[in-house]
């Protein structure tokens, strides 16, 4: 065998045409792209191949249908080898003919692999790619079969929606391509709208805390047979209207512990030892009614843990979500992760049909550093090991998000092949996308990873730069990061494309500097204004659309920063005053609230700094100015962040007294309900045309106490938060 191999290699080198398929030679070609099937996938593959061969060689290969191939032709489609699975492909060169076949989208991914591995083309981001022009394209002997690590692969990057090639090149899919009629997660209210059934049939919805809770965000009474029949009819009509789809999601609305606890539902869940019991029982009935269809349902928050007895039917897909896990180390290395892993291992014992939704994102601060590159591969390997066949790696993929392009590139590669060399891929991307700046950015990434782990601070999906100001973002490290970015910008100063990419990658450090600065009592106002102006200039230049999941604009942030966080000309008379609570804040906020309401520091969009909260109750406190003073206004600043169940209160009442006992009513202010998803601040102010002499100011707040029917915490305690009381 060895003698034969050496003989064949010698013959191949002496007669290269025996081992090569020649597509273009010295700028000339007679090759054709032949489609075995005249369908959209084949045409997508052909157009992609034609486009990039033309970009490399300036030769445009014709595309023809169902013709007999000859030497030098490219055959797309046809029968795939038996070992090819969903989205997998085969590439072979035989008798001078290049053959690419695949299942589902496989022929497109085969073309991408050919262009990457044999023509040396890299696709980095939105209409951003690298290639080396050549007048000759000769392919070696190829016999390759590749199958994806996951049959469905999804992530987030702005380029998916702005560049028609990007998604194909990264071998990604989107829910609307797979799931019927947009029925993908949190579908209960779409299938059984509370606006239609809630008033007349509250029994269709969750029972807890002594009553039914119909509402847009409520869950179903899964033991109610009428609910099942209505939903089954809806499912039937949806699939009939979408005959090309075979999967849809029947899954709980967003929110936690809003499940039904009626006697029948509770009996199922108690027997199963998990709140997923009733939903899997329901889904199995649906799967049996429609055996040729597939149903995806969430194992999310209260349904994360698997049932003890009932097993999901093969056509029930478990969408398992690790939303509560911290991200500073792998899932097997911290307590929150271990809890999830235990649940995942439990599911993997009873089903092979698992979809893992992994959260590598900071929902509250897309532009904050999120150094989790070191955990990506181990976590994805873990998912695959535990029978995950579908995977959504959710990242901050919006324009300006922390290394959005690199992050999407890496998770896409890992979802296709969990065994790739991640460090090599990272360095390859950095050099290709940032040029000579790459070594400095690589150092920045690695130093921050080490600093995060060394700090012992958690990294989570509602994080804030302020949480890390004594850890990975402490002053000495921030100076080092900025020095590395200075070197990176200098290295590519003469190359505008690379320079802009480096400047965009710097935004998270600039944003972090501003966020940390607003929490400091001593401020270098000249420096802050300079940094704020530059940040605003850059987010406009790079068209950064949003700071967070709630769609708050970075341009609005800059405006708000100047109004809210920069020192005002007139000082509050309440600064440093004594605060006495009549109805104290909840939990840890009682201690934090001793000074926070009168320290002159306004809180940010997250509630990790400066905010004081009350849960499920009203609030009341007295501010002692220390002596009688003349005042004309009092204003209390509130936070609205529905994702954290933080709502504006219903009412604020102000009164005052000179002796601290006999109070005079000043003003009662009723607040309008706010339902927007955006994070908002609202100052509730009482004013007097004439000065009021007083020492004590009482603030009484009537909270919503309970999340309303439209909120996904329906029926559970709501919060209100105050960061500052201003008296002038």
Which role fits each region the language model picked out?
Residues 29-30, 38-41, 45-48, 52, ...:
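Feature activates predominantly on carbohydrate-active enzymes
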Residues 62-85:
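Short, well-ordered secondary-structure micro-motifs within conserved domains or adaptor modules
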Residues 226-229, 338-437, 443:
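Structured mid-domain segments that build the active-site/substrate or prosthetic-cofactor binding neighborhood
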Residues 296-324, 367-374, 400-408:
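Substrate-binding cleft/loops of secretory-pathway carbohydrate-active enzymes
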Residues 414-594:
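Catalytic domains of carbohydrate-active enzymes that cleave complex glycans
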């Amino acid at each position: 065998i060895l003698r034969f191999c050496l003989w064949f290699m010698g013959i191949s080198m002496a007669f290269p045409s025996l081992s090569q398929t020649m597509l273009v030679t010295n700028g000339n070609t007679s090759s054709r792209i032949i489609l075995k099937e005249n369908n959209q996938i084949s045409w997508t593959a052909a157009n992609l191949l034609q486009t990039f061969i033309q970009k490399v060689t300036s030769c445009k290969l014709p595309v023809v249908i169902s013709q007999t191939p000859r030497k030098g032709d490219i055959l797309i489609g046809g029968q795939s080898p038996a070992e090819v699975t969903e989205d997998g492909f085969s590439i072979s060169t035989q008798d001078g003919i290049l053959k690419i076949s695949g299942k589902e989208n496989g022929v497109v991914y085969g073309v991408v692999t050919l262009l990457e591995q044999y023509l040396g083309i890299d696709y980095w981001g939105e209409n951003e790619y690298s290639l080396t022009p050549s007048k000759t394209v000769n392919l070696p002997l190829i016999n390759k079969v590749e199958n994806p690590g996951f049959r469905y692969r999804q992530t987030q990057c702005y380029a998916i929606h702005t560049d028609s090639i990007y998604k194909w090149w990264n071998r990604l899919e989107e829910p609307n391509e797979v799931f019927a009629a947009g029925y993908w997660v949190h579908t209960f209210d779409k299938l059984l709208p509370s606006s239609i059934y809630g008033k007349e049939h509250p029994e269709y919805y969750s029972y807890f805390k002594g009553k039914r809770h119909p509402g847009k965000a409520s869950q179903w009474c899964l033991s109610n047979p009428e609910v099942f029949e209505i939903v089954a009819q809806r499912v039937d009509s949806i699939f009939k209207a979408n005959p090309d789809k075979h999967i849809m999601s029947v899954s709980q609305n967003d929110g936690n512990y809003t499940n039904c606890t009626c006697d029948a539902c509770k009996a199922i869940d108690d027997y199963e030892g998990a709140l997923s019991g009733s939903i899997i029982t329901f889904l199995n009935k649906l799967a049996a009614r429609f055996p040729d269809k597939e149903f995806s349902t969430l194992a999310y928050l209260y349904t994360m843990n698997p049932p003890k007895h009932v097993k999901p039917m093969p056509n029930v897909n478990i969408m398992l979500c690790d939303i509560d896990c911290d991200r500073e180390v792998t899932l097997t290395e911290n307590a929150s992760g271990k809890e999830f892993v235990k649940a995942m291992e439990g599911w993997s014992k009873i089903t092979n049909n698992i979809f893992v939704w992994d959260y590598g994102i900071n929902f509250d601060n897309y532009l904050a550093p999120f150094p989790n590159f070191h955990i990506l591969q181990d976590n994805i390997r873990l998912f695959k090991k535990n029978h995950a066949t579908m995977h959504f790696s959710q990242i901050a993929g919006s324009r300006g998000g922390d290394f959005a392009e690199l992050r999407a590139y890496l998770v896409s590669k890992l979802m296709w092949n969990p065994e790739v060399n991640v460090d090599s891929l990272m360095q390859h991307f950095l050099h290709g996308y940032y040029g000579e700046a790459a070594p400095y950015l690589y150092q920045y990434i690695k130093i921050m990873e080490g600093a995060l782990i060394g700090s012992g601070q958690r990294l989570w999906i509602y994080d804030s730069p302020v949480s890390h100001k004594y850890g990975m973002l402490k002053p000495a490290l921030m100076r080092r990061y900025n020095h590395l970015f200075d070197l990176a910008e200098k290295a590519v100063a003469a190359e505008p494309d690379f320079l802009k990419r480096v400047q965009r990658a710097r935004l998270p450090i600039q944003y972090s500097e501003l966020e940390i600065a607003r929490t400091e009592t001593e401020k270098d106002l000249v420096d802050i204004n300079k940094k704020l102006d530059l940040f605003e200039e850059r987010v406009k230049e790079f068209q950064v659309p949003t700071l967070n999941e709630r769609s708050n604009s970075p341009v609005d942030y800059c405006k708000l920063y100047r109004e809210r966080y920069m020192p005002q000309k007139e000082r509050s008379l309440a600064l440093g005053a004594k605060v006495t609570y009549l109805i104290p804040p909840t939990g840890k906020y009682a201690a934090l609230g001793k000074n926070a309401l009168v320290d002159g520091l306004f809180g940010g969009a997250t509630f990790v700094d400066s905010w004081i909260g009350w849960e499920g109750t009203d609030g009341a406190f007295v501010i002692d100015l220390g002596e009688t003073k003349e005042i004309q206004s009092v204003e209390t600043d509130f936070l609205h962040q529905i994702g954290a169940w933080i709502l504006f209160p219903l009412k604020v009442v102000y009164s005052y007294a000179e002796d601290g006992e006999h109070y005079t009513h000043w003003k009662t202010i009723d607040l309008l309900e706010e339902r927007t998803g955006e994070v908002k601040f609202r100052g509730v102010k009482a004013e007097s045309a004439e000065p009021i002499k007083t020492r004590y100011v009482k603030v009484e707040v009537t909270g919503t106490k309970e999340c309303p029917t439209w909120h996904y915490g329906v029926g559970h305690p709501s919060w209100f938060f105050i960061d500052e009381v201003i008296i002038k």
